[in-house]
Design a protein with these regions (language model features):
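Flexible beta->alpha loop and helix N-cap segments adjacent to enzyme active/binding sites
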Residues: 2-3, 9-13, 17-53, 98-113, ...
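Active-site pocket-shaping loop/turn-to-helix segments
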Residues: 47-58, 270-277
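Short, well-ordered amphipathic alpha-helical segments that serve as non-catalytic structural scaffolds
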Residues: 54-71, 282-287
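Short beta-strand-loop/turn "lid" adjacent to the catalytic site in phosphate-handling enzymes
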Residues: 69-105, 123-124
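Short glycine-rich phosphate-binding loop at a beta-alpha junction
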Residues: 74-85, 296-305, 405
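A mobile "lid/hinge" subdomain adjacent to the ATP/sugar-phosphate binding pocket shared
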Residues: 233-266
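Short acidic-aromatic active-site loops that bind/stabilize oxyanions
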Residues: 261, 265-281, 501, 505
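Phosphate/ATP-binding catalytic cores across multiple sugar-kinase/actin-like superfamilies
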Residues: 273-298
């Protein structure tokens, strides 16, 4: 059976916050996934193809991308799996039949299946994990509206959902959790917006199309700058300030606990720190309570946008509550269509087969396609027949503090660049963080850069000993190694790290091994291959355009190396 999961707006402009009737229309992270006879073919986010950050519109380009990858036509699709969303306009079109009519007109032979928002999140984690049996927890801002069938008078949404699965026995039990207010995701998001405005001393509408999906990550990075405060018991559940109280719920904090008396904080840095620490404490308390009540097993999958918070993930990882934890590389809404497609295949009793590296689900472009694009742009390039020699050259240039645009293998699926569509640099000199930021990324100064480390050298550089193959954990840098990787060490001595092996990512692992041979350091600075506010590059054409527009020194794409004709240095 050919199954297509798709997510996005339908007959409305989903990139606008409101329509002419002031209905909320904002949708983000549209895309599509194709599974054929249980085999994963392709997953892609719409933004990577349209070049519109967080694009939420109907994923036409994503559908075509997936069908092309599977060499299929619209008539070949047997089942469409559509995650629902927390928008009244979506439900209006659902009940009017608009969504079904649009899909059946495109896919004449397909059945349509609608899947709960949180169920789609859960499935994205369950069917990408290594264990066959366990439980799951979904936490985000808001999932599906539930008033239509469970509650008659009041609108409720999924916020905290749990469940149990056994793949061998084809068991998947889902229990949507309903809270009226203060779900982890929306509370953190709302306060992050207000703290960010205070930090930059500028009022920005919470639905501003440039910023609206980015507050959380910015404030998580800022929180380290307030870590000089000792987080004592009296700061747990404290009110940050009257100006920062969540508008709709002025007197409660995470999970509805009452505020303690108001405290005075000097600046936005301290407020960001207190918000983050309260998030971590509330998350750990909540998960501990569920575990103690036997709602969660020893093997756990986490999904939902709240699990992009790497600091919170790290607290759970170190808690000792579970024998194994799985967070997929796409825990946020990016993974919804993937999860919905997987759930459709599961219900069809198909065994789901994913690539060995579950983060690399996009297209792998051929050397011929790459060379053709280089010729289309009239670029001078050098081709390496031996990939190790290419990595040796690249490692030598990294050791000279050059900025490398790195384009290899299948593209990443999810919000992180994981060594396939990355910008790389030497992690040692502290100034390299500022050089990368001023020349290329143009981000807020307080946001750190991540690193990639060879897995077998993880314990040489970091205190914690757990792997982080999808950059979903933050680890503590050992004191004696801080200066060696200063450009990726945050002000609180942590690093958002990715661990790699040659088995899962041979290209970037080979490069880092060669870099270790010339520098002595088995780590590189890694950030996404894009400018601030742009999607990560997807195609060779995207990479070449970014190379031409950004102040980077080399483009290493497939077996080809392109050098900037004029290189500027700070």
């Amino acid at each position: 059976m050919n199954i297509l999961g798709l997510y996005g707006g339908f007959d409305w402009d989903a990139n606008k916050s409101f329509n002419e009737h002031q209905d909320l229309t904002w949708t983000h992270d549209a895309g599509a996934t194709l599974i054929s006879n249980g085999n994963h073919i392709s997953s892609i986010s719409q933004e990577r193809l349209t070049r519109i950050k967080y694009d939420g519109n109907f994923p036409q380009e994503s559908i075509d991308y997936c069908l092309s990858a599977g060499n299929l036509s619209y008539e070949d699709i047997d089942l469409i799996c559509v995650p629902s969303m927390c928008l009244t306009i979506w439900y209006k079109q659902y009940y009017e039949g608009t969504i079904t009519k649009k899909l059946t007109s495109l896919f004449p032979n397909a059945k349509i299946k609608f899947v709960s928002h949180h169920l789609s999140h859960a499935a994205s984690a369950v069917f990408s994990c290594d264990f066959n049996e366990g439980s799951f927890l979904v936490l985000d801002g808001a999932g599906s509206l539930l008033y239509s069938y469970e509650f008659k008078d009041t609108q409720h949404v999924e916020t905290n959902s749990i469940g149990y699965f056994n793949k061998k026995k084809s068991i998947f039990r889902f229990f949507p959790g309903i809270h009226n207010v203060n779900e982890f995701g929306s509370y953190y998001h709302s306060l992050s917006h207000k703290i960010y405005c205070e930090k930059i001393q500028k009022q920005i509408n919470g639905y501003d199309e440039k910023y609206r999906e980015s507050w959380d990550g910015k404030i998580m990075g800022l929180s380290a700058y307030g870590s000089h405060i000792e987080f004592t018991e009296d700061l747990k559940d404290c009110q940050l300030s009257k100006e920062l109280v969540y508008d709709e719920v002025p007197y409660v904090t995470f999970e509805g606990r009452p505020y303690k008396e108001n405290h005075t904080f000097k600046n936005a840095d301290e407020k960001a720190y207190i918000l983050q620490k309260n998030f971590e404490c509330a998350l750990l308390d909540y998960v501990t309570e569920l575990k103690n009540k036997s709602y969660l097993d020893d093997y756990i999958c986490f999904a939902g946008g709240s699990f992009l918070n790497v600091l919170g993930n790290s607290v759970l990882k170190q808690s000792g509550l579970f024998k194994d934890i799985h967070v997929p590389p796409y825990p946020n809404d990016v993974g919804l269509h993937f999860g919905a497609a997987c759930f459709g295949a599961f219900q069809n009793k198909e065994e789901i087969n994913l690539p060995k590296n579950i983060a690399l689900l996009g297209k792998n472009y051929t050397q011929e396609e790459i060379e053709q694009e280089l010729q289309n742009f009239n670029l001078d390039y050098q081709k390496y027949e031996n990939f190790e020699e290419l990595c040796e050259f690249t490692a030598q240039e990294l050791n000279k503090n050059k900025i490398i645009g790195w384009f290899q293998n299948r593209s990443e699926f999810g919000p992180r660049a994981l060594g396939s569509r990355s910008l790389l640099m030497h992690p040692g000199p502290a100034k390299n963080k500022d050089i990368m930021n001023s020349r290329v990324k143009h981000r807020e100064y307080w946001r750190p850069f991540a690193g990639i480390v060879l897995e077998n050298h993880l314990n040489d550089y970091f205190v914690e000993d757990f792997c982080s193959p999808y950059m979903l954990y933050s680890l503590t840098v050992k004191k004696e190694k801080k200066n060696e990787i200063a450009a990726i060490t945050h002000v609180d001595n942590t690093c958002r790290i990715q661990t790699v092996t040659k088995e899962l990512q041979p290209e970037v692992a080979t490069l880092i091994q060669k870099f270790k041979e010339v520098s002595g350091i088995p780590v590189v600075l890694n950030t996404s291959f894009n400018d601030n506010g742009e999607p990560i590059v997807e195609t060779p054409e995207d990479a070449i355009k970014a190379f031409n527009n950004l102040d980077i020194d080399y483009l290493v794409i497939g077996n080809y190396v392109v050098k900037k004709s004029e290189i500027s240095y700070l």
